[in-house]
């Protein structure tokens, strides 16, 4: 399993619990260190779990695969920043610091190009992302990101929609859709 937006390490923890080898790439060194500590609590001697600090747009994944004798990844899971809704760092390479939607999508496309070429044939890549609401309109980040995959020849297998009630991004605005519909 490859997670190019590792963040808190949830996918690596779950991979360990299932006995699956996993590699996570995180841009921010402090986040990578903290996540590695949490991941090591769930240590599983029966699988490889590796945390890498780097930029998923250009990290040399091939050398990593050679190091661990990995012929291909069987699953890639991407949970990128929701463009600029939450600024995760001051790093200019952080997708959450993209100045425009096109810049965000171009950078996201670079991650797709750099990671999915190592995906085993007939295997899957999942993208977890929410949409953005700004200037009285919905910006459908999920569909824009999905289109980045389609433009690269991926086949769409499913669109799963989950409404999270209370989140940091919604800031106590559970009734916002009712308000906007009126």
List PLM regions with ranges.
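Class I S-adenosyl-L-methionine-dependent methyltransferase catalytic core
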Residues: 1-182
């Amino acid at each position: 399993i490859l997670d190019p937006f590792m963040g808190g390490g949830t996918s690596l923890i779950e991979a360990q619990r299932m006995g699956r080898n996993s590699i996570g790439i995180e841009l921010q060194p402090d986040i990578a260190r903290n996540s590695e500590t949490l991941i090591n609590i769930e240590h599983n001697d029966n699988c490889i779990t590796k945390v890498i600090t780097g930029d998923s747009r250009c990290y040399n994944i091939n050398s990593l695969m050679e190091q661990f004798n990995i012929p291909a990844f069987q699953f890639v899971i991407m949970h990128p920043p929701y463009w600029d809704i939450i600024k995760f760092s001051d790093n200019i390479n952080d997708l959450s610091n993209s100045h425009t939607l096109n810049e965000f999508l171009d950078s996201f496309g670079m991650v797709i190009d750099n990671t999915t070429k190592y995906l085993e044939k007939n295997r899957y890549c999942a993208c977890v992302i929410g949409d953005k609401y700004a200037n009285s309109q919905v910006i459908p980040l999920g569909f824009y990101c999905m289109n980045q995959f389609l433009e690269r020849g991926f086949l769409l297998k499913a669109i799963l929609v989950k409404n999270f009630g209370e989140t940091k991004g919604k800031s106590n605005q559970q009734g916002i859709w009712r308000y906007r519909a009126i």
